[in-house]
Amino acid sequence: DLEWIFLGPGTTTYYIAKALAHRSSIHVLTNNLLVANALGGSPSCEVRLLGGNIHSEGLYTQPANLNAELKGVYLSKAFFSVDGVDINSGYTLSDLNVLDLFKTIYANCGRMFMAIDSSKFNRRAFMKLDNLDMQHSVITNDDPPENFLAFYQSRGVKVYTKSTIEKAQ
């Protein structure tokens, strides 16, 4: 509560927004039109949408001057999804615009979460976003393959899955 978080483009972050819709006193910065729609009608959520051109395929906005739009903005947490996760290639994306957004947000947030649905493991997309051992946490719907779990554990990357969250409740 009361933190400013960023929810990036993609359907995975949209589902995070839906899960947050019942929370009170949250503040969300996003460029994801689905996220803005999911949270925008809630009186207990403050939602700010980044301006700019709308990318209709991904349903997100891209500011003309990203650095100017985000100058002086600091976020407690940021949530991004990716198109592929590979042990050797790291996190990969299909959209160059998301790469610039990620790098800018990553530099201005306290804690980064990579939201990865289970279909993205052992896949590579067009371009590299970052290595798997970057400073972050992972959220996924199912347990990742064993080689990913071992990799993350050996580097101190916190992994949240449906089963670990259910155990904590």
Tell what function each PLM region has.
Residues 19-24, 39, 43:
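Active-site catalytic pocket residues across diverse enzymes, especially alpha/beta-hydrolases
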Residues 1-22, 28-31:
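Helix-turn-helix/homeodomain-like alpha-helical modules used for DNA recognition
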